[in-house]
A protein has these predicted regions:
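Hydrophobic, membrane-embedded alpha-helices of multi-pass small-molecule transporters
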Residues: 9-19, 162-167, 176-240, 275-284, ...
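Hydrophobic transmembrane alpha-helices that form the core helical bundles
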Residues: 29, 79-113, 284-300
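Selective recognition of specific alpha-helical transmembrane segments in multi-pass small-molecule
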Residues: 51, 55, 151-163, 195, ...
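Membrane-water interface regions at transmembrane-helix termini and the short interhelical loops
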Residues: 62-70, 126-148, 209-212, 319-331, ...
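TM-loop-TM module centered on a large, flexible mid-protein loop between adjacent transmembrane helices
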Residues: 67-75, 235-285, 292, 301, ...
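Hydrophobic alpha-helical segments and their helix-loop junctions in multi-pass secondary transporters
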Residues: 92-96, 153-176, 193-194, 241-245, ...
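Membrane-interface loop-to-helix entry segments
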Residues: 134-163, 334-345, 365-371
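C-terminal membrane-solvent junction of multi-pass transporters and transport-like membrane proteins
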Residues: 348-414, 425-430
Length: 430
């Protein structure tokens, strides 16, 4: 059996895995931009930034597969391609470079020390540390993370408490159009739904370690510990969004990191900014090391390349992309995430109820239809839209909520279920 203490410890471990310091830049700006609509915006953000990652872990628990096999019921070939794209997204193409860029910008850029020389020196040192600890099994970085994360959480708590209860700032009464859609799509940027599938095995192994539990008990343990993580994340994200909404009357900026830094400075003074820079940089560093190790282990398991070579290549690519800066990396990620997230969310939903779905063609239909809509929305985000694609997106139900793909996914499910209802559960290659 397990105790309440075990649930809390596992819950906070899951919280630490899903809580990326780099994700702190999103809630304040969402609150700042949406003003009195901040609560609806954050509800949507929490659904995609917190809820779906939790469901991702549950779906892996139910399906019994890791990320390499997560989409096997579509086809083994598709599953492998899906896994590669997902690992690249949370690895050298998006997430890892963003950790370096975030750490640099919070430390230097918005503290009056902007310089190309500082940037290159900082990022070289940053990724030098990443590659050093990724190549060598060492518990030092874990210990650093265990020290910095609590300090960061205390600092965040102080910012939230002071911003909410000890300031006389009021939220602007403006109503933001499409507030839910804004938050829902911004939640994609956390990339935690993708990461949750990759990390699910670690959490599941931790639950089973040293315990004799039935499958039902394991699932109950996971749900309860997951709720601890979800509530913790929701409180932090929601608190920062509310503080951001109140900052509109005293701060003028359109930059996410600048808003976070100036908010901290306004509420806690210069020393608060210094502590924020140290803690966020350290947290980003530990996140980057974990992601680089994940990329190295994944590609060394499916290719003939050695772990060390993959790590070096991953860090080099991440360094080069980090030079672009946080906003540029976010802009690059938008069309990619808009395309792959509908497919990922669909697969999570299907795997959650997989034992009730006897026909693998249903998986193919849902992925096909949601993938097409995701591709259209991706092209639209790049400005490659036309009259016909715009017309398709406009007539689809739930498009105002960022759920343009939902109705096509349901159609794909029904259509392929009827077309192949006599098909047995088989695994075909594309």
């Amino acid at each position: 059996m397990y105790k309440t203490k075990d649930i809390l410890l596992t819950g906070f471990a899951l919280f630490a895995m899903l809580f990326g310091a780099g994700n702190l830049i999103f809630p304040p700006m969402l609150g700042y931009e949406t003003s009195s609509s901040w609560l609806l915006t954050m509800l949507a953000f929490i659904i995609t930034g917190v809820g779906f990652p939790f469901l991702g872990i549950l779906s892996v628990s139910i399906a019994g597969n890791g990320i390499k096999d997560f989409a096997n019921r579509v086809s083994p070939t598709f599953s492998k391609i899906f896994a590669i794209i997902s690992i690249l997204a949370i690895g050298p193409m998006l997430a890892i470079p963003r950790t370096g860029a975030t750490a640099y910008e919070i430390t230097f850029l918005y503290n009056g020390m902007e310089s190309p020389i500082y940037k290159y020196i900082y990022l070289i040192c940053y990724f030098g540390i990443v590659i050093l600890f990724s190549l060598r099994a060492n518990k030092v970085i874990d210990r650093v993370g265990k020290i910095l994360t609590p300090i960061l959480l205390i600092l965040l708590f102080l910012i939230i408490v002071k911003g909410i209860f000890f300031t006389n700032l009021a939220v602007k009464p403006d109503i933001y159009p499409h507030a839910f859609k804004r938050g829902f799509l911004e939640g994609y940027q956390t990339m935690d739904t993708i990461a949750s599938i990759a990390y699910a095995g670690i959490i599941l192994a931790a639950i089973k370690s040293g315990r004799t539990l039935t499958q039902k008990q394991e699932f109950s343990f996971l749900v309860k510990s997951g709720l601890v993580a979800i509530v913790s994340l929701a409180l932090i994200y929601g608190g920062f969004a509310f503080v951001g909404a109140k900052m509109h009357s005293v701060l003028d900026t359109q930059d996410k990191i600048e808003l976070l830094v100036k908010t901290t400075s306004y509420l806690l003074g210069g020393y608060g900014n210094l502590v924020l820079a140290i803690c966020v940089a350290g947290a980003c560093l530990t996140t980057a090391i974990g992601l680089v190790a994940t990329v190295g282990e994944f590609f060394s398991s499916i290719t003939s390349f050695k772990y060390e070579k993959i790590v070096i290549f991953t860090v080099i690519i991440s360094f080069l992309l980090s030079i672009l800066g946080v906003e540029s990396i976010i802009n690059i990620s938008i069309p990619i995430l808009v395309f792959i997230y509908p497919v990922i969310i669909s697969l999570i939903s299907l795997n959650l109820f997989g034992k009730y779905i006897k026909n693998n063609y249903v998986y193919k239909g849902v992925v096909l239809f949601t993938g097409i809509i995701g591709l259209i929305e991706s092209l639209d985000s790049l400005g490659l839209n036309n009259y016909y694609t715009d017309s398709v997106l406009e007539i689809l139900p739930f498009s105002d909520y960022g759920l343009t793909w939902l109705f096509p996914g349901i159609i794909g499910y029904i259509l392929f279920s009827l077309m192949f209802r006599k098909a047995k559960m088989i695994e075909n290659k594309l």
